[in-house]
Regions:
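Nucleotide 5′-phosphate-binding alpha/beta core
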Residues: 1-51, 56-91, 98, 134-146, ...
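Short acidic/polar alpha-helix capping motifs at helix-coil junctions
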Residues: 44, 96-101, 149-155
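Short, acidic Gly/Pro/Ser/Thr-rich loop/turn segments
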Residues: 59, 100-102, 254-257
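Alpha-helical membrane-targeting segments
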Residues: 88, 106-115
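Rossmann-like NAD(H)/NADP(H) cofactor-binding core
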Residues: 91-93, 201
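Short, well-ordered beta-strand segments
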Residues: 93-95, 248
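Conserved coil-to-alpha-helix start sites within the AMP-binding
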Residues: 98-109, 127-128
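Active-site glycine/GP-rich loop and adjacent strand/helix microenvironment
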Residues: 112-259
């Protein structure tokens, strides 16, 4: 609060040091210029700047200081490592969107090249396009699949129609991580059958970090290393274990743009 005028304004004249007295933010609170939300001693040029996808209906630009950004990636690398995925050497089949403008598209392709991944764009997943995707799996030694749940499920249904198990034609595959959208149990069973590899579910938010990740025992493991996760009722009171409520998440390390 002492270092960020945006939060000082939200708190107002309250002088309490109690955690529960702090206001809970929503994305509408953040619909103002980034420069008005950054902490003292930070500028857009000294931080990592990105924007959310808008899947919740309220897209916005956010920032992370370099230390927080590095810790986010350390958290991701650690969890993928549970499944013997090494970001330096493992080759990723990536089912994600990509900017359509020329410069944005080329930047993303260069990032893919440097990050050891091959991107399948998800804007057109017709049978003709999926046939081309299948050819890539026949000819490239992918180690793992990562991307949007719905796109990966659609590819699995295509394989089912062809009576093909992906592991049979791409034996280097080890695991598939799905993200961004809910994975239903029926779809997970389909993916396991048509891919022939373990299916791992993750839940995250780009402005925060991985929030929860399925561990090797098949259980959801909440990220308590970089986030403080609370389950609250409609009056913002902490609920007892096992009760349903709202996820309220605090990033523990982002000093430039606290959440």
């Amino acid at each position: 609060i002492n270092n960020n005028s945006f939060y000082r304004e939200l708190v107002g004249s309250k002088n309490s040091t109690a955690w529960n007295d702090l206001p809970i933010l929503n994305k509408k609170n953040l619909q103002k210029p980034l420069t008005e939300r950054l902490s003292k001693e930070y500028s857009p040029k000294s931080v990592f700047v990105n924007k959310t996808s808008g899947s919740s209906g309220d897209p916005f630009v956010f920032a992370k200081d370099k230390y927080a950004h590095a810790i986010t990636w350390a958290s991701i690398i650690h969890r993928f490592g549970w499944y013997k995925i090494n970001f330096n050497t493992s080759f990723q089949a990536r089912f994600y969107g990509i900017p359509l403008d020329f410069i944005g598209n080329k930047k993303e392709r260069i990032k893919d090249l440097l990050s050891n991944r091959y991107r399948f764009t998800i804007f057109d997943l017709s049978d003709v396009v999926l046939e081309k995707v299948l050819v890539k799996f026949r000819t490239k030694k992918f180690d793992y699949i990562n991307g949007y749940t719905s796109s990966i499920v659609l590819f699995a249904k295509f394989l089912q129609s062809k009576n093909i198990v992906l592991k049979d034609i791409c034996p280097t595959l080890k695991v598939c991580m799905v993200t961004s959208e809910m994975l239903f149990e029926d779809d997970k069973i389909l993916l396991e059958k048509q891919f022939g590899i373990p299916i791992v579910n993750e839940y995250g938010a780009s402005e925060l970090d991985l929030i929860a990740f399925q561990n090797t025992n098949g259980d959801w493991q909440v990220n308590a290393e970089t986030l403080f996760v609370e389950i609250l009722d409609e009056n913002n009171h902490v609920l007892p274990y096992g009760k349903e409520g709202r996820f309220v998440i605090t990033s523990l390390y982002n000093k430039a743009h606290p959440f």
